[in-house]
Amino acid sequence: MEIQGNRKKTVSVVGGGLVGSLNACFFAKKGFQVELYEAREDIRYARMVSGRSINLALSHRGLQALKAVGLDEKIAAMGIPMRARMIHSVKGRKSSIPYGKQHQYILSVDRANLNKELLSAAEKYSNVTMHFEHKLRDCNVDSGTMTFLNNMENIIEKKADLIVGCDGAFSVVRKQFMRKSRFNYSHVYIPHGYKELTIPPRKGEFAMEPNYLHIWPRNTFMMIALPNLDKSFTCTLFMPFEDFEKLTTGDQVLDFFKTYFPDSIELIGEKKLTEDFFLLPPQAMISVKCSSFCIDHKCVIMGDAAHAVVPFYGQGMNAGFEDCLVFSELMEQYQNNLRICLHEFSRLRVPDAHAISDLAMYNYKEMRAHVNSKWFIFRKQVDNILNAIMPTTFIPLYTMVTFSRIRYHEVILRWKWQKKIINVGLFTVGTTGSVGAAYLVIKYLPFNKYIEHVGNCLTHLKGNAYLSRLWAK
């Protein structure tokens, strides 16, 4: 516990979303006086919950953070295990691609229900006070003062020893960082938006296999579906905005789905599909990078406020939860010395945040296009074989990201090294096979047949896209 004079130090957590409410638990457990401020009303009692609703994929990093505050088992019970991707072709064929080994899976969890549980967990600490409908207007990180506007339109001034900004991709706390010199910031809106649809239960049961993340990859766009506890599926259609703009009538939507997702129409229902498709406009997705994550020992940002990422690796929440865990581990290592912990946290997490942002962008290309290719399936099999033979040396990319706590930037370094080794190995095997075949041809074929065979081989090799890429390098 951190003491200043004869009082506990006060930590103000701005943002009562997933990362903010979990952070409140971490700081409260360490004995700090925690004040949590949330701009929205308390979602546990709200009639309608606004905001993002993309289903979340909870994996190892997030579970480890929850375990540190004793919430992992309770939250895991709220999720549905997904052990593999289920790929849906245009013709309706289905094929599965396991995420990892048989015991490895990710959990489909509902964002709102998870947020409610985390708020309730934080509220149980006697040293946590929650303030809902308190919108941060301004803060002075040098003095630790904050200005809020409450639901009565009253201006409220508050002060804290440490301000923790967990207020999302459009963080007000982060804006204060931008007033400082040597603060780097960039954001990108990707050209794709998303719409959400629902596959209802069929006769009280799941309409599709429940323990999969279902994917309809269509190269430039895709649809996914995650299972819910009520036996429904939440579908998300990711597509370029200009393609959404072409679909203006129910008939156009039906024609589009009949062309690209024909097997989903019966699952969703024609009437429900044409109604739900136009409930909301397509939503945008933003990726945020910045550095540093702290100002002196007075303020730190975490979660989307520090590193909003696109949702295609399922790591946004997990990375945010890992922020909380890493900071807690640093507090233990440095005996709650905020001056050391904040700067060390920023030093460690900035490269990892940038790395998972890049990986999320890469995985969108993989999910919507690469999973269709036989080469992708072959490489997955090669990765799995090498991992079985050398489990500590060769670890598949997805396994490193999702089922370990290897730092994200180290994941990329290891992945690039592994790719290089595998490519060299495959090239060597291919070359050895070609040389062996050539030897047999020379030894046993007549000369004129040999010349004809060599010509055919050269024609084949020139058309081999993979070998051409290797030679180009």
From Swiss-Prot:
**SUPFAM superfamilies named in the record:** FAD/NAD(P)-binding domain (SSF51905)
Q: Which family does it belong to?
A: Belongs to the aromatic-ring hydroxylase family. KMO subfamily.
Gene Ontology biological process terms from the UniProt entry? 'de novo' NAD biosynthetic process from L-tryptophan; anthranilate metabolic process; L-tryptophan catabolic process; NAD metabolic process; quinolinate biosynthetic process
Q: Where does FAD bind?
A: V19, Y37, E38, A39, R40, A57, R111, L136, D304, M317, N318
> Topology versus the membrane, per the UniProt entry?
Multi-pass membrane protein
- Where in or outside the cell? Mitochondrion outer membrane
Native source species: Xenopus tropicalis (Western clawed frog)
GO cellular component terms listed in the entry, alphabetical order: mitochondrial outer membrane
Cited InterPro entries: FAD-bd (IPR002938), FAD/NAD-bd_sf (IPR036188), Kynurenine_monooxygenase (IPR027545)
Q: Give the binding site residues for L-kynurenine.
A: R85, Y99, N363, Y398
Give the top-rank taxon of the lineage listed in the UniProt record for this protein.
Answer: Eukaryota
Q: Which GO terms describe its molecular function?
A: FAD binding; kynurenine 3-monooxygenase activity; NAD(P)H oxidase H2O2-forming activity
EC numbers: 1.14.13.9
**Pathway assigned in UniProt:** Cofactor biosynthesis; NAD(+) biosynthesis; quinolinate from L-kynurenine: step 1/3
The UniProt entry, under Pfam families, shows:
FAD_binding_3
Cofactor needs: FAD
Recorded protein name is Kynurenine 3-monooxygenase
Name the gene for this chain.
Answer: kmo
Tell me the function of this protein. Catalyzes the hydroxylation of L-kynurenine (L-Kyn) to form 3-hydroxy-L-kynurenine (L-3OHKyn). Required for synthesis of quinolinic acid.
